[in-house]
Regions:
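A short LG(V/I)-centered, amphipathic sequence patch enriched
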Residues: 50-69
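Residue cluster at the C-terminal edge of the helix-turn-helix DNA-binding motif
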Residues: 25, 34, 48-56, 129
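N-terminal winged-helix
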Residues: 98-129
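Short helix-boundary/capping micro-motifs
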Residues: 20-38
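C-terminal regulatory
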Residues: 171-245, 250-274, 301-320
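Residues within the DNA-recognition helix of helix-turn-helix
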Residues: 38, 45-48
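Short beta-strand-centered segments that line the small-molecule binding cleft or hinge
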Residues: 125, 143-179
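Alpha-helical linker/hinge and terminal dimerization helices associated
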Residues: 52-53, 74-96, 295, 306-309
Length: 320
């Protein structure tokens, strides 16, 4: 089906960005909050875009939001267009050595509450260099989403526990995160002392998969546990653990209040404790080259300084 759209105007770019936001957020409600516009205006944007293109992009209504094949193609083309526009703006800005625009940072949920995380200090350092000419947009998500957002250009920088390798993506270790296996009040193992819990008993109880993190752990706890529910992210894991339905892994720093209140407990930390690396992720190429290089250096510097103050050495660099 051919499109009626022969030239792309500023209006078309705005409409396409609204459409892409709806797709990225999985529906109108989340996109409305992200764009800070009413749902009626967002709906009008989509309707206008469909009229200008000459075909329907998606189904919406009581049944929810569902993409059509035409919508899938327009979405992919729009993402490529946005990336090209961003690269053009960055190149033009760098001709005059100007640092301006918007930088998107994707962070894994609960990363900020880790005492070892120095992202706020890094952002402060970055802000002292560029002032308010650069707008920061920070989005919280699951690890595999963070790296995929960086890989496809939706985000310029990521901070995540994910160690998945992607083309044209560079990673550098910042600090380690400790995770332990937990169960909630009401779980059969909750009141059983650790010394009475065997590996066989652990394996007999449903385990909540962490999705993207399972590939990094080939121990008993991914090979032999009974398949349970799936919790993508620390908060999702906590919801399932608190329900008493599953055993599950959560970063230790995210559980402190719940442990103190007796809602959850760590199970056999002597054999279940896991250490996972937190990394800064960026593309080798892409828009805002100087800006991203500066931001990345601020992130690495903030964590290296913290590491040295703690008596450790700066983390080594690695690329993927």
């Amino acid at each position: 089906m051919s499109s009626k759209l022969k030239q792309v105007t500023d209006l078309d770019l705005r409409l396409l960005r609204s459409f892409a936001e709806i797709v990225d957020r999985g529906g109108f409600a989340a996109a409305q909050a992200a764009l800070n516009i009413s749902q009626s205006v967002l709906s009008e944007h989509l309707k206008t875009l469909e009229i200008r293109l000459g075909y329907v992009l998606c189904k919406r209504g009581p049944g929810g939001f569902k993409m059509l094949p035409e919508g899938e193609r327009v979405y992919k083309a729009a993402k490529q267009l946005f990336l090209a526009v961003d690269e053009f703006k960055a190149d033009i800005g760098e001709i005059g050595d100007e640092m301006s625009g918007e930088v998107v940072i994707a962070i894994e949920d609960e990363i900020i509450t880790n005492p070892a995380c120095r992202l706020p200090e890094a952002l402060q350092m970055f802000g002292e260099r560029v002032g308010r000419r650069v707008r920061l947009r920070v989005e919280s998500m699951v690890g595999y989403q963070a790296i995929s957002h960086v890989a496809d250009g939706s985000a310029h920088l990521g901070i995540s526990v994910s160690d998945v390798r992607a083309r044209d993506v560079a990673t550098q270790h910042l600090f380690d995160e400790v995770a332990e296996l937990y169960c909630g009040q009401g779980h059969p193992l909750f009141d059983v002392p650790d010394h009475e819990i065997s590996e066989a008993q652990l394996a007999a109880h449903p385990y909540s998969s962490r999705g993207h993190l399972e590939s990094r752990d080939v121990s008993l706890f991914t090979r032999e546990f009974r398949a349970g529910d799936v919790g993508l992210g620390a908060q999702a894991q906590l919801a399932l653990i608190l329900s008493g339905r599953n055993l599950g892994y959560v970063p230790v720093h995210a559980t402190t209040p719940l442990v103190a209140r007796g809602r959850i407990r760590s199970v056999r930390p002597d054999i279940t404790r896991r250490v996972v690396p937190i990394q800064v992720i960026s593309r080798d190429t892409g828009p805002h080259g100087k800006l991203i290089a500066l931001l990345r250096s601020c992130v690495v510097m903030a964590h290296s300084t913290a590491s040295m103050h703690a008596g450790g050495a700066p983390a080594p660099a690695s690329t993927g």
